[in-house]
Amino acid sequence: MSGASDIPSFRWTQSLRRGLSHYTTQTKGDVLRDAKSLVDGLDFSQVSQVQRVMRKERRSDDDLLKLRDLNKAVDGLMMMRNKQSNVSLKVGGLSKDELMELATDLEKLKRKINTNERSTPGVYQGNLTTAQLDRRSAILRSLGFQSRQGQNNGVVRIWDIKDQKQLINQFGSMPALTIACMSVQGAEQMNDVVQGLTTLGLLYTVKYPNLDDLEKLSAEHTCLQFITREESANNISGYNLSLAAAVKAGACLVDGGNMLETIYVKPDVFADIIKSLLRVKHQERMFVSEKPGMRNPYENILYKICLSGEGWPYIGSRSQITGRAWDNTTIDFSKDVMYGPPPPVKNGGNIRLNPLTDTQEAVIKEAISKLNPDETIWVDIEGPPTDPVELALYQPTTGYYIHCFRLPHDEKGFKNGSKYSHGILLRDIENARSGLLSRILIKLPSKLVLTCQGSDDIKKLMELNGRPDISTIDLSFPTDQARFYESVVWEKFGSLCTKHNGVVLSRKKKGGNSGEPHCALLDCLMFQAAFEGNVPSIEPKPLLPSALVFKSESVVAM
């Protein structure tokens, strides 16, 4: 609950409470109404079964089905349910800088959570038997590694299931459920449970309650004795009576504490909440840490708010929500954003800002739709990102590629680039379709990830064309490795591009041909060959007709 040890976690929590106080609500009445509904309507024999499941060292698909069925029953009995209300944020309610910051933080959070789920208990990671796990624990103890309290002597609890996605949103505690379980399974009066949890909640206004605090408070409130002494961990179900679950329940019972747990999110105030959250983040210099481990307070609230878009992010039932925070809250830069520098307006009247026809736009859209965003897509350009003259996108798994040219604005710089790099002659691209390169970039899918050899120019190109949402994977091969297959690629695929006809000189030696020119398309093929260790075997196939790429080669009317 407290997050990472190297940050002022509770101070961050207090600052978030103050900064988001306008969005907190009084939840005690709603929580108690749902708790009574669960007491009356829930089959607690099923609750006991699920609690036994969560104590097992290895859990199966049948165990997961029991958990999901019970979660569905709980959701049906509760009023405090989170609704699936996916949000797409655009420039307007939030500034472009705020949207960029939010997108970056969600991406970092995605990497952190995915790393945790791959490397920590709770997700199936192998086939160790119980005997092997016990033996491993004994080895660790013999080497002086003491097991922490609540970790069951190192026994790892894993989900041995077919579809790990079925685990998403099936965990996390709900105050109404915690109160109901403590009342029924502990044979306690609900009023006594409320009093004990309220005491924990009041303590939570000044510090994170710990196990020592729990021990002392249990002497006064016997109902607190039912709270487990295990430390909090990932994939703890709402049916585990953990300290974190009890503290969360207590927070909801304290009226006037501006507790984060009582925040209620509605679609019409979603952007305002995010804006306030980012403001507090800057004041306290909060951040998303990509180190594996529990979420810090900023990471926790960011994930919870962005998960459903409507409801109680901390305390409402969310088991019927699909997707993760980064799936359900997306950043859309495709509208209300000026893409690249505006074209000059000539004296005397109207000009078409987009030089392409609607039919040509449709051809581009269809071509891009054939690139699978979940598979590797190479990108390369020739010329500087501020004045590119060639663009190529290539997908190795299908052989599909998009390849186009553009007339330069800076002819002097272009000639220098031709002389020492790409070898393109101006006369060979004088009929290149105006506006095609930028429209291809604009129509690429949102948040696409492109693979490249050297990312600085690609990133700048995307930013200049209004596509900062597109990210890159830079393989950063050494030059010799990157161009190892150069001659083989040119020999096999050189006929794909006939626009590099100039002599290319070496910058290192005075005079003399430096070898093959740099072609954006063939470089993509060459980099893929360097990555795979052999030349691509799938025949490259163009997605754009030459009649669109070059005006003079028109065969059919576009």
Curated annotation (Swiss-Prot):
Pfam family, one: Arena_ncap_C
Site keyed Important for exonuclease activity: positions: D457
Subcellular localization: Virion; Host cytoplasm
Single Gene Ontology BP annotation: RNA-templated viral transcription
Keyword Transferase: no
Binding locations of Zn(2+): E390, C497, H500, C519
Single GO MF descriptor: hydrolase activity
Sorted UniProt keywords: Capsid protein, Helical capsid protein, Host cytoplasm, Host-virus interaction, Hydrolase, Inhibition of host IKBKE by virus, Inhibition of host innate immune response by virus, Inhibition of host RLR pathway by virus, Interferon antiviral system evasion, Manganese, Metal-binding, Ribonucleoprotein, RNA-binding, Viral immunoevasion, Viral nucleoprotein, Virion, Zinc
Role this protein plays: Encapsidates the genome, protecting it from nucleases. The encapsidated genomic RNA is termed the nucleocapsid (NC). Serves as template for viral transcription and replication. The increased presence of protein N in host cell does not seem to trigger the switch from transcription to replication as observed in other negative strain RNA viruses.
This protein's name: Nucleoprotein
